[in-house]
């Protein structure tokens, strides 16, 4: 199927809509999901007798993972809230086996119920209304289909001084971004969900089978690192979305390790929505980083969270 379905995004383009230069930097500065990441998802899908017909890549940005998904699935739906991102995805990926939508993740009434074999949601679900989003995703999944959710992006550096400056840059950048938004509370809640356990995806037992997997890869004791400024209060904090029946898995994988020079560290920081401010408001902090790192390579790893669940044989009211 080949089509472009228009919609009206309702969240600030200051967070989501990015140009081609940003996405080129994103591909350079963010972790490359290793083969083991996709192998785990496909293996889970196969073990639960999933089909490889249609996958919906939600909150896809410019579709950095869509090409990989197309290698396994006959049809890939690429959706994002920002029209600019979807246009870039279509220009890069073409129309052979791809369909494009401009839409919030929560808005999916145009997708026929039970028509999707897998929903693939990477680095996006924390921005959404959790209950509304999960009902929308469950509605489009066929019984036995797979919900595959993941988050990765913030680095953990082995050098404690580098990590400390990196944390300060992230928090300072978040403060700048929050000042530009009409609804900063929404972004605060999103950042809060990414801190620690990556608290997303309430799995209603009527919609998803018991035994869902919540996988921590290379996870530090404190969990994931969010840029949430410590002085900013989140007025409505989510309760834990982990069910008693969920299977908790902790593993280490060498494929998520890295060694960065100063240029690569800069590319990584510039891959965040506040990245453009490195050359302006954040320049004093960046000079601290340059003076500390100089010509060294800094080792570290990418913590990752993967959530895998199977659609139950039930309707969504």
Curated annotation (Swiss-Prot):
Q: What is its EC number?
A: 2.1.1.-
Which family does the entry's similarity section mention? Belongs to the methyltransferase superfamily.
- Disulfide linkages recorded for this protein, renumbered to the chain, are none
Keyword Glycosyltransferase attributed: no
Q: Which controlled-vocabulary keywords does the entry list?
A: Methyltransferase, S-adenosyl-L-methionine, Transferase
From the UniProt record, which GO molecular function terms apply? S-adenosylmethionine-dependent methyltransferase activity
**Pfam family name, one:** Methyltransf_11
Which GO annotations describe the biological process of this protein? methylation
Annotated membrane-spanning segments are none
For this protein, the record's InterPro entries field holds: Diverse_substrate_MTase, Methyltransf_11, SAM-dependent_MTases_sf
Protein's organism: Claviceps purpurea (strain 20.1)
Q: What's this chain's function?
A: Methyltransferase; part of the ergochrome gene cluster responsible for the typical purple-black color of the ergot sclerotia. The ergochrome gene cluster produces several ergot pigments including the yellow ergochrome secalonic acid and its derivatives, as well as the red anthraquinones endocrocin and clavorubin. The pathway begins with the synthesis of atrochrysone thioester by the polyketide synthase (PKS) CPUR_05437. The atrochrysone carboxyl ACP thioesterase CPUR_05436 then breaks the thioester bond and releases the atrochrysone carboxylic acid from CPUR_05437.
Q: What turns on this gene?
A: Expression correlates with the formation of the sclerotia and thus the pigment production and is directly regulated by the cluster-specific activator CPUR_05433.
This protein's record includes keyword Transferase = yes
Protein name, as recorded: Methyltransferase CPUR_05424
What pathway is this protein said to act in by its record?
A: Pigment biosynthesis
CDD domains found in the cross-reference section: AdoMet_MTases
Chain spans, region Methyltransferase domain:
57-149
What SUPFAM superfamilies does its record include?
A: S-adenosyl-L-methionine-dependent methyltransferases (SSF53335)
């Amino acid at each position: 199927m080949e089509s472009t379905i228009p919609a009206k995004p309702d969240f600030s383009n200051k967070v989501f809509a990015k140009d081609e230069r940003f996405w080129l930097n994103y591909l350079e500065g963010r972790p490359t999901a290793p083969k083991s990441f996709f192998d785990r998802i496909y293996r889970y899908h196969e073990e639960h007798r999933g089909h490889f017909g249609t996958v919906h890549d939600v909150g896809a940005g410019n579709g950095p993972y869509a090409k990989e998904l197309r290698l396994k699935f006959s049809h890939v739906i690429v959706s994002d809230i920002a029209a600019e991102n979807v246009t870039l995805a279509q220009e890069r990926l073409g129309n052979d086996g791809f369909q494009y939508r401009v839409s919030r993740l929560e808005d999916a009434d145009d997708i026929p119920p039970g028509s999707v074999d897998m929903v693939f949601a990477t680095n996006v679900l924390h921005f959404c209304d959790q209950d509304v989003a999960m009902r929308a995703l469950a509605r489009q999944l066929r019984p036995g289909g797979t919900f595959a959710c993941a988050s990765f992006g913030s680095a953990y550096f082995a050098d404690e001084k580098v990590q400390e400056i990196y944390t300060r840059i992230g928090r300072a950048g978040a403060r700048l971004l929050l000042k530009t938004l009409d609804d900063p509370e929404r972004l605060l809640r999103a950042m809060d969900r990414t801190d620690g356990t990556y608290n997303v995806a309430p799995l209603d037992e009527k919609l998803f089978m018991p035994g869902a997997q919540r996988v921590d890869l290379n996870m530090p004791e404190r969990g994931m690192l969010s840029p949430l400024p410590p002085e900013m209060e989140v007025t409505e904090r989510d309760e834990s979305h982990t069910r008693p029946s969920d299977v908790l898995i902790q593993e280490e994988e060498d494929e998520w390790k890295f060694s960065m020079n100063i240029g690569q560290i800069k590319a990584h920081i510039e891959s965040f929505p506040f990245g453009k401010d490195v050359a302006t408001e954040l320049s004093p902090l960046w000079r601290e980083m340059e003076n500390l790192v100089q010509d060294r390579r800094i080792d570290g790893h990418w913590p990752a969270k993967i959530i895998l669940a199977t659609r139950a044989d039930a309707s969504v009211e």
